[in-house]
Amino acid sequence: MSQTKQTFSTELGGRPLTIEIGQLAKQANGAALIRYGETAVLATVVASKQPKDLDFFPLTVNYEEKLYAAGKIPGGFLKREGRPGENAILTSRLIDRPIRPLFPDGFRHDIQVATTVLSSDEDNSPEVAAMIGASIALSISDIPFDGPIAGVTIGRVNGEFIINPTMSQASESDIDLQVAGTKHAVNMVEAGAKEVSEQAMLEAILLGHDVIKELIAFQEEIVAAVGQEKFAYTVASFDETLVNRLKAEALAEVTTAVQVEEKQARDLAINEVISKYIDQYAADDSITEAQLAEVSGVLNKFVKTEVRRLITEDKVRPDGRGLAEIRPLDSEIGLLPRAHGSGLFTRGQTQVLSVATLGVAGDAQIIDGLGLKAEKRFMHHYNFPPFSVGEARPMRAPGRREIGHGALGERALLPVLPSETDFPYTIRLVSEVLESNGSSSQASICGSILAMMDAGVPLKAPVAGIAMGLIKEGENYSILTDIQGMEDHLGDMDFKVAGTKDGVTALQMDMKIGGITRQILEEALEQARLGRLHILEHMNSVIAEPRVELSKYAPKIVTLKINPDKIRDVIGPGGKVINGIIDETGVKIDIDQDGTVFIASTDQDGINHARQLIEDIVREVVIGEEFDGTVRRVEKFGAFVELFKGKDALVHISELALERVGQTEDVVKLGDKLKVRVTEVDDKGRVNASHKVLLVEGMSPEDRAAYDEKKKTERDSRPPRRDTGSRPPRDGQRPPRRN
């Protein structure tokens, strides 16, 4: 790589995109600094010197968000970045998926792609910059790579498509589409949408590819200027003599084995063929040790070629289904009595138990990344234990795959959730994969819908998901509906589509080949739509509408609106007031900055009591209002009467009785009930009230006339005030102040 900084510029979505090469990370095989607006991402790639002895391609992609990029200091005791967050993991996957198919078959050098966000504004996507940066770093390096690739985000506001929408535009968009590909074809799609038609999604994908082609032409100029020659590499290959012998002796048995319909029986049949020929060739003196080590690999290659041949030529799938046929469906709800909602969805040998839990606003997840701090009130977590595929492996924390599948389900379900105003609950869904033979992520979407409907969540519409596959040999191809594990593993495409009967809510496409054409995309989307409608019909037969009542174990939530200026009164100094209410009533209370108060509990009486306490605290006292109060304090000058919890009024001694009162205790004592009327509220909120005015109004006309006459006589009999005249002038100067 050149050691002198070189700069290349273009525009993306009407904003400047600048690539700087040759200044940073010069010991990496390839490095580039991408500036997009005020967003800056460093992309580096490194390859091991020697290939690894592995049967897979060891590619690692990392996307790192440094909080200094947004002018933030990490929280916690250590004050440094910890494990990558969910967004970083999902972005790593977004970069990995389009570049992985473009490395040579059999390439076994360790490859590490690292993209680091160094600066981030709120409008220019660091994810897009990182994907472009990874492609440029690979393309200019000496690492064999059949790129470049590029990626863009497509949104749609008021029917108009937008390239790389800003944050404000994204909030109004009904499509959130990330698309990546080469100059020839699209090879990665990730999308969320608000029940958008298949045709609109196709148009968005194709628009994205048009932009991608422009970005790739820009990258090719960079490669021509600073690109390195690719290093030579060796690809492991099987012994040709062994391949030919096994083809003659074992291919027919492999063909029979791959057509066993049941998954475990099919796996057993394939393993028996492999074991048979390993044992047979181990006893054959003409077979070398090196050839014997390759027997399993050759036979597994035959498994792949035969499955693909049967599908593309004979239109026969391993389990005997037609290309567009969906496996048998079975569903059940309400399996777990103490859970708020549960749904079991089974499709063939894939089975998912989804469980819905309803929580309060305080249960929302706090998201504090490079962007603005936000709360997430809907979560979908996906778990894939080893027993689901009949394996004994360590039970570990969720990996990238589980996090990715959980996020896909979340994206698919989000558009049909009720608004927070209509349903002020935090919703957590957990999908437990109990059996897996492909399409478990889509089964988790179906199971989650069943669980939420069982929980009484008022969904706008049910959603179903289906996974499509592709087997392509030259110009000959077959699109598969509801792929099973073997078809996913040996096929060329995994295309997941989720949506309602009216439109798509999520898409995810991964390719193992260079890309696919518009025709294949169109056919796959239409085939997926028909499959989705079939699954929705089945789900509707199990539960057609969400339950009217929530589970008795779910919290009930009541909301009320208070003046935001009164929030501090409800909270109190150090939280004293609100904690007192919580302790007294046993409820949970959350308050938004706009004055919305959420009160939650399984006990309705506790909710009602807490609501009354809060309403009393924020209540505005009006002159003329009457209260049946309680005497809480007695002073020489009058009594303090509690009108309601948290609000007292002073009843002056002259306002306690009709006659003159010598001592306050002569009329009232602590704890006495006293009816009063508010006569004054000062600018500090202090209240004066009168009991006497109510006594006067309660008199009969005769008594009132006599009382008024008596008061008049008393006033007339008082001696006149002494007239002291005006104050005389001061003589001389005022004495100085005392120190």
UniProtKB/Swiss-Prot annotation:
The keyword Chaperone does not apply. Mg(2+) binds at D488, D494. Involved in mRNA degradation. Catalyzes the phosphorolysis of single-stranded polyribonucleotides processively in the 3'- to 5'-direction. One of its GO terms (molecular function) is magnesium ion binding. Residues 555-614 form the KH domain. It catalyses: RNA(n+1) + phosphate = RNA(n) + a ribonucleoside 5'-diphosphate. The gene is pnp. It comes from the Bacteria. This is Polyribonucleotide nucleotidyltransferase. It is an enzyme of class 2 (transferase). Gene3D superfamilies: GHMP Kinase, N-terminal domain, K Homology domain, type 1, Nucleic acid-binding proteins. Keywords: Cytoplasm, Magnesium, Metal-binding, Nucleotidyltransferase, RNA-binding, Transferase. It is found in: Cytoplasm. One of its GO terms (biological process) is RNA processing. Residues 701-739 have a biased composition (Basic and acidic residues). One of its GO terms (cellular component) is cytosol. Its cofactor is Mg(2+). NCBIfam families: polynuc_phos, PRK11824.1. It comes from Exiguobacterium sibiricum (strain DSM 17290 / CCUG 55495 / CIP 109462 / JCM 13490 / 255-15). Its EC number is 2.7.7.8. PANTHER family: POLYRIBONUCLEOTIDE NUCLEOTIDYLTRANSFERASE, POLYRIBONUCLEOTIDE NUCLEOTIDYLTRANSFERASE 1, MITOCHONDRIAL. The keyword Cytoplasm applies. Residues 698-739 are annotated as: Disordered. Residues 624-692 form the S1 motif domain. SUPFAM superfamilies: Eukaryotic type KH-domain (KH-domain type I), Nucleic acid-binding proteins, Ribonuclease PH domain 2-like, Ribosomal protein S5 domain 2-like. Belongs to the polyribonucleotide nucleotidyltransferase family.
